[in-house]
Amino acid sequence: MRVIGTVGMPGSGKSEAATVAANAGIPVLVMGDVIRQECRDRGLDPAQHHGRIAQALRDEHGPGAIAHQSLPIIEDHLTDATTVLVDGIRSDVEVTTFRDAFGDDFTLVHVSAPRELRKARIEDRDRPGDTDGEPLDAREDRERGFGMDDAIDLADVRIENTDSLDAFHDAVRDLLAADTPHTEVPDNHD
């Protein structure tokens, strides 16, 4: 059993890493999907209310609320798969929740890219929530407020996403294929 979590600032490549995992047949739990479902359950448009509902869930149920809501989904995936990727961890409390639940079978991967590159990627992609008018600075500040920097500091592995898309895909595939969950992967695959 392996549970691989990704952490990183907006536009770093977390969703792209999840796509690589999904293409390899690995179940992916997108923590943002938990929030989007909560928006719908509250009769709100996820594209317009994602950030506010993410904060509301944490205010109402504690800083680990989204991770706790994710655990049964992950455990369900693990009945049929040996590896699950959790996309989009936002706080050290969420990291602790997953480490408590899965112990040494949990690996946290920091997907890293410089701010200007991330900003350009966000501007180029067409994803709900990216165009809701929230500037990148505000979004980063909100995520830092959740404990993003502390979560990043807890990462077991870092993948630097500054090269080509193919190189990044190779790095993610190397991590997914590693014999041990905490195997360091090279930052560059030239």
Curated annotation (Swiss-Prot):
Record GO terms (molecular function): ATP binding
InterPro entries on file: NTP_hydrolase-rel, P-loop_NTPase
Gene3D superfamilies: P-loop containing nucleotide triphosphate hydrolases
The UniProt record lists the keyword Ion transport: no
Stretches of the chain forming a coiled coil according to its record: none
Chain spans, region Disordered: 120-144
Pfam families: AAA_17 (PF13207)
Claim: Zinc is one of the keywords in the record: no
UniProt binding sites for ATP: 8-15
Disulfide bonds: none
Keywords: ATP-binding, Nucleotide-binding
Family: Belongs to the UPF0200 family.
Protein name per Swiss-Prot or TrEMBL: UPF0200 protein VNG_2452C
Species for this entry: Halobacterium salinarum (strain ATCC 700922 / JCM 11081 / NRC-1) (Halobacterium halobium)
